Amino acid sequence: MDTTYWGRSFGVMLFKDAITKENLLKFYIKTETNYFYHQGIDQLQAKGYNVLAIVCDGRRGLLNSFDDIPVQMCQFHQAAIIRRYITKNPRLLAAIELNELVRLLPKTDKESFKGALFEWFNKWKTFLDERTINIETGKSFYTHKRLRSAYRSIKTNLKWLFTWYDNIELGIPNTTGAIEGHFADLKNKLRNHNGLNLKRKKRFIDEFLKV
């Protein structure tokens, strides 16, 4: 499940079956909230669908809000979070190594990644703990705050980054790539119809998504 936007106040939240590739449900929304994601899952279950697992982008509070359903965080979204903290081409050696490690996410297993992350942290722990003093206030702050935040993000989300591996028999995708590709195709086609008003745009989306 995932959401895409046109502008700031018109979006489509889509629920897709990863096995059959069928679009199951959609909402037109102004704001992406966890409430709508829960509403979607509830509606699907009420219709008789057996929700074996959920793949989502890792919104705050969403990953741990489904008590009885395995949740996989999209590994591409995790990589994007890291890039926002340390950029796509970091200069610090510690950041370069972390960036290279994150690139392995879709290609490795849980034990290998956890072991490599543990080794990275032990290697750079002293560096991460470095502090800088503000000469005007006398207060100190972490010198490499964004790198620390990048590491903390991975460490916090690690529980949900390998749900596919912990439940290998379910065949859970490790990304929301199928939906994102669908959204990209939809947006490309809509660019050829820029003059559509909201009502006609919704009609176009309805016909494209067939749900």
Please give the residue ranges for each predicted region.
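Glycine-rich loops and low-complexity Gly/Arg-rich segments
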Residues: 23-27, 37-42, 49-53, 78-81, ...
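Acidic/histidine-rich catalytic cores and adjacent linkers
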Residues: 49-60, 66, 100-211
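A broadly conserved detector of short glycine/acidic/proline-rich loop/turn motifs that flank catalytic sites
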Residues: 5, 80, 190
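RNase H-like nuclease fold core
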Residues: 1-60, 64, 68, 157, ...
